[in-house]
């Protein structure tokens, strides 16, 4: 489930939405049929990704507690906020997947549906925020020029995340009681996807500028073993950055597609095909997991800022 692909469906037939004023506005599979069609793949998807996100949360908390101050000594706040956001995202995703995955239960309470939908959206915001803060740490640590200075600071990213989360809460609550206000959900989904796409592109731009700076500094590398070793370390970091950029760009492009396509609030379909849903959501969960993994890898490979 993503923040833009859930639906509360009680019946298994094609009854009208009007009987269920609190139903979700986005199309989803007919869960009674979908679970039978997907079989063991449904179970593997739910419990597999629940375990992955639980590990992401556990690793984030463990790293905060056991490794604080080990790296990025001048940017402990950045580091703590980034890993805290990952911990929240991993925890919320795993809870929702284990409790009521994609709001697929036929006997879900209204409060449970609303909690799951909002929690999933908050997790999406936290993953995107962590992805952004990791880029900020890299840009500041390597002193790479990238965009206006007032946009390259932790308070700005935290404020942006909180604004997105508050708008998410507002839009979900309004649409919950007034489904005709679905444009609010649409704006929320497009904003999240666009934010992620911009950050993904910035990873590539920052990486390209770091590479340019590295090549400029390698003129005398053969005179300095230390410089040569540092250049190799930076090359590995750049490779990770480009992979993170690629996976992020694909993920947020898929998110944008689902927001404006047949998975979105303006789709004319009520139900979508089980296998179409499974492919899209499995792809997104995989890419989100890889983004988190690459954040951790970049943390270990990034240069110290002493």
Labelled PLM ranges:
Residues 33-306:
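Alpha-helical multi-pass membrane domain signature
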Residues 1-34, 267, 271-273:
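Extracellular/lumenal N-termini and interhelical loops of multi-pass eukaryotic membrane proteins
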């Amino acid at each position: 489930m993503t923040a833009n692909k859930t639906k509360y469906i009680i019946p298994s037939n094609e009854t009208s939405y009007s009987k269920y004023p609190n139903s979700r506005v986005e199309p989803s599979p007919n869960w009674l049929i979908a679970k039978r069609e997907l079989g063991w793949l449904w179970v593997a998807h739910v419990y597999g990704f629940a375990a992955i996100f639980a590990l992401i949360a556990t690793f984030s908390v463990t790293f905060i507690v056991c490794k604080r101050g080990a790296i990025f000594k001048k940017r402990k706040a950045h580091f703590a906020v980034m890993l805290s956001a990952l911990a929240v995202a991993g925890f919320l995703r795993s809870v929702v997947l284990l409790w009521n995955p994609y709001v697929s239960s036929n006997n879900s309470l209204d409060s449970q549906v609303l909690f799951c939908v909002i929690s999933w959206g908050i997790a999406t915001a936290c993953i995107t925020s962590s992805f952004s803060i990791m880029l900020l740490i890299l840009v500041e640590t390597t002193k790479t020029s990238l965009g206006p200075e007032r946009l390259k600071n932790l308070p700005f990213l935290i404020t942006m995340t909180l604004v997105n989360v508050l708008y998410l809460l507002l839009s979900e609550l309004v649409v919950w009681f007034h489904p005709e206000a679905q444009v609010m959900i649409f704006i929320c989904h497009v904003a999240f996807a666009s934010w992620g796409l911009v950050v993904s592109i910035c990873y590539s731009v920052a990486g390209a500028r770091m590479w340019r700076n590295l090549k400029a500094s390698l003129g005398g590398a053969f005179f300095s073993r230390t410089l040569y070793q540092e250049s190799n370390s930076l090359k590995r970091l750049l490779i990770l950055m480009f992979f993170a950029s690629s996976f992020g760009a694909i993920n947020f492009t898929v998110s944008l597609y689902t927001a404006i396509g047949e998975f979105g609030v303006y789709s004319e379909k009520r139900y979508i095909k089980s296998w179409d849903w499974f492919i899209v959501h499995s792809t997104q969960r995989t890419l989100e997991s890889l983004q988190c993994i690459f954040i951790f890898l970049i943390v270990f490979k990034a240069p110290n800022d002493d």
